[in-house]
Amino acid sequence: ALDAVPTTGGMVVIPAGTWMFGSKDQMTSTTEVLSIKSKTVLHLCAGATLKLVEYGKAPNNKTLFIGCKNKNQSDIVIEGEGETSIIDGQGTRWWKARDNKETFNPGAMIRFEKGSRFLIRNLKVQNSPGVNITLSNSNGANNGTVHDVTIYNPSSETKTEQPSHNTDGISIWGHHMNIYNCNISTGDDNVVCDDNAQYIHVWNCDFGTGHGASIGSFTKNIKHVWFDNITMNGTTAGIRMKTGINSGGTLRGGGEEDWKFTNFTMTK
């Protein structure tokens, strides 16, 4: 259905029910499983669950599950009708692969590269094999908005269920991105700004388990980042700034024009 959307644009509606996507060939490739073209709305009705097919062995290559990879696509919307509109990555097998020291190299559940004007709203993303939402990956995507989205992956430290690994809630690598009114619990960073994250505003969000509001470890050309009115309950850190030997860069020094963190509340 997504392939049939004309170049002039259109909407693909997922009705209530459970709908599987993905094939073995797709899961072991480096292409999209669900590829979204410009001027397309992917709408999940209330009660609709879009579920990634589960396999007995984790894929050997990074796979992009939903979005557009290495393509200059713009004006894309992924939306639902609230928390009963669900995208479920069934990530348990991937997380177990990590624990068993098997190949563990999952891609992002939702990822937009290049292009501009991306909107994700009013739904729930859960159990991603890897990062839940990636906005660009140093390829120039810009002008993205995520709002009223619930993201849930088990904590990497949980003792009551399978821990998830490298499951950042929202990973930002582009510029002019707005994140607001989101509830995010993960096994890694709740929201993280990496290379080329500029003019980023994250506000009115609740962070559960995870590593908090993070900068890095890819820190090249990060500036004009503002986290405001963030409530945290169960995070391992409030603000987490990190880098690595092979992933560092220039992180300009914390002035009002560079990055700021305001109105944080930690309840646990």
Q: Across the structure, where does each feature detected by a protein language model lie?
A:
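Extracellular/periplasmic carbohydrate-active domains that bind, remodel
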Residues: A1-K268
